Amino acid sequence: MANIKDIAEKAGVSVTTVSRVINNHPYVSEDKRKRVFEAMESLEYTRNIHAVHLSKGFSNMIGVVLPTVNLPYFAELIAGIADAAAESGVHLSLFQTNYEVQKEIFALSQLKQRQVDGLIFCSKALADEKLMEWEGPILLCQNSDNARFPTISIPHQEAFRNGLDYLIAKGHKKIAICLARKKGMNSHFRIKAYKEALEEIGEAFREDWVIEKAITINDGKALFHKWNTWKEKPTAIFVANDQVSAGLFLEAKNQRVSVPDELAILSVDNHEISQALGITTIDIQTREMGKQAFAILEKRIQGQPIERKVLDYRLIERSTV
């Protein structure tokens, strides 16, 4: 395999000149640049990009840590990250964890070993205190009280409260909520908003009306049947996921339960499925979050100060409330 010295000899220039051409240095004459390119083509030279990056102290690779790629929320987030990474010529390495701590730690070990230049945690099981034990640029796509990490998020407590107030203004007091998991930081803020809203309207908090482990359309269908078995039924369910909302809506329709007359559904995401089914939802700019997550992490890798950004949200009225 040809090396830089071989190219220099064939082109009749110095090794320094070849290096300048390969690294796109401006101070090389067009004649010499042309001769170097011709020599590279003749010798079928392929630049070892990985070696170049390592010599400069970075891998040109960003790690993206997420529980699954099979949900539209994470797919949208990755799409935004990928769009921004492509514009910067940076490659992505995905770490799918299923919220398993050891898999998250493996991703962190790749950062420690400089296999990636930084990590974007889309969602995680590890506590922030555990992340503090690891060095390197780490960005969180969620709220965090820890000032060590750059973050990008929406104000989940405020957005959820906005949705609850909307339901209350529509006449609903018996409201259930459905989350992906109760342990997450975002869910912590949502439950807090829920309790505060109930207290203000004089309704008791009911633990059984806080449903979790629901992320798919089938989970939404199961949620309908859970609702249907309750002796005292909530008149509205606030679901933190468009997929679950879609399953709930479709099963209600299949069972001839009128939405919103018998059951109102409010969702979060504003993905295509909620648009197609006419589900009222809160747009949280998932793709934009991914783009800005990459931009913030890239600046951090370059040594710029920690940035903590909060995106806007908006409630989109359709036909399910």
From Swiss-Prot:
GO terms for molecular function: DNA-binding transcription factor activity; transcription cis-regulatory region binding. It holds the Pfam family Peripla_BP_1. The keyword Metal-binding does not apply. Residues 4-23 bind DNA. Residues 1-56 form the HTH lacI-type domain. It comes from the Bacteria. InterPro entries: HTH_LacI (IPR000843), Lambda_DNA-bd_dom_sf (IPR010982), Peripla_BP/Lac1_sug-bd_dom (IPR001761), Peripla_BP_I (IPR028082). GO terms for biological process: regulation of DNA-templated transcription. The keyword Ribosomal protein does not apply. Gene3D superfamilies: 3.40.50.2300, lambda repressor-like DNA-binding domains. Keywords: DNA-binding, Repressor, Transcription, Transcription regulation. Signal peptide: none annotated. Disulfide bonds: none annotated. This is Uncharacterized HTH-type transcriptional regulator YkvZ. It comes from Bacillus subtilis (strain 168).
